[in-house]
A protein has these predicted regions:
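Bergerat-fold ATP-binding/catalytic subdomain of histidine kinases
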Residues: 25, 128-139
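Short alpha-helical segment of the dimerization/phosphotransfer core of two-component systems
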Residues: 7-12
Length: 180
């Protein structure tokens, strides 16, 4: 009973935090504490923090953060974006699957690709995936606020970047954070 209660309390806490941040983003009240940051180091830290969750679920988490990616941004908010992308990939990947996180420079931008072997996202759901409170038509078993990707995309936009999606049902998804 205690583990279930702890899990539910954690969900309510995350929901409250997400609602608060979403409201602040909507009202343009989020200020970035910008400085030089190393996107590959932030990515490595997030992946390290998610390793136990992936192992517990039976998901292999692979990382390739060897490419130096200096960016100008708010390290806390960048970690928040990466945390959302990596934990989503773990949640939507079945046991025995794999999540791969790769840092690379592409077309003069710093990019982090988070690719999973999960269920994928139906083409009709893809245009709405960054919308507030959105859940895919196939998502019936995951606790979610429906705000994580919205918040991640809005934070990426504050950094003058974006999150791109490539997905195929039954084959998985790839979310790519790209920053100038």
């Amino acid at each position: 009973l205690l583990p279930v209660l702890q899990e539910r309390v954690g969900f309510v806490r995350r929901l409250t935090e997400d609602l608060f941040l979403a409201a602040k983003l909507e009202q343009k009240q989020v200020l970035l504490n910008e400085d030089r940051a190393r996107l590959e180091a932030l990515t490595a830290a997030v992946c390290s923090a998610c390793q136990a969750e992936a192992a517990h679920k039976g998901v292999e988490l692979r990382t390739d953060t060897g490419t130096p990616l200096p960016v100008w941004g708010d390290a806390v908010r960048l970690e928040q974006i990466l945390q959302n992308l990596v934990t989503n990939a773990i949640h939507y990947t079945p046991s025995g699957g794999r999540v791969t996180v790769v840092c690379a420079a592409e077309n003069g931008r710093a990019c982090v690709k988070v690719t999973d072997t999960g269920c994928g996202i139906a083409p009709e759901d893809q245009p709405a995936v960054f919308d507030r409170y959105f859940h895919t038509t196939a998502d019936t078993k995951h606790d979610s606020t429906g705000l994580g990707l919205t918040i991640a995309q809005e934070l990426a936009h504050l950094h003058r970047g974006e999150i791109l999606l490539q997905s195929e049902p039954g084959r998985g998804s790839c979310f790519t954070l790209c920053l100038p």
